[in-house]
Amino acid sequence: MTDLRHYDVIISPVITEKSTMISEYNQVAFNVAPKATKPEIKAAVEALFSVKVKAVNTIVRKGKVKRFKGIVGRQSDVKKAIVTLASGQTIDVSTGL
C-alpha cells in the first residue's frame, strides 16, 4: 500500500471531549473512509504515525435527516475508528501529519 492510500484511509482525527477522555486508555479516534476495513486502518495508522496498533474498533454514525427551506435532505454517514495503541505508544493528534 502506498502512502497516498494511507492518507485516503485516514480522513481526520476526532477531537471531542469524549475522544480526549479515551486517550487515558491509550486510544485515539479518527474519521476514516466509509469503505475502509479494520486491517487497512491499522496499516495506515502504523505507517503514518510509526506506532504499534493493538486493536481497531469501528463505528458508523448514520447521517441525520435535515430540512432546509422545506426541502428534506440527508447528511452523509460518517465512519469513525477507535484505535487502541500498544502500551507505551502515543500519538499527538494536535500536530499535523
UniProtKB/Swiss-Prot annotation:
GO molecular function, one term: structural constituent of ribosome
Keyword Zinc-finger: no
Record's keyword terms, sorted: Ribonucleoprotein, Ribosomal protein, RNA-binding, rRNA-binding
Matching NCBIfam families: PRK05738.1-3, PRK05738.1-5, PRK05738.2-4
Family: Belongs to the universal ribosomal protein uL23 family.
Physiological role: One of the early assembly proteins it binds 23S rRNA. One of the proteins that surrounds the polypeptide exit tunnel on the outside of the ribosome. Forms the main docking site for trigger factor binding to the ribosome.
PANTHER family for this protein: 60S RIBOSOMAL PROTEIN L23A (PTHR11620)
Protein's recorded name: Large ribosomal subunit protein uL23
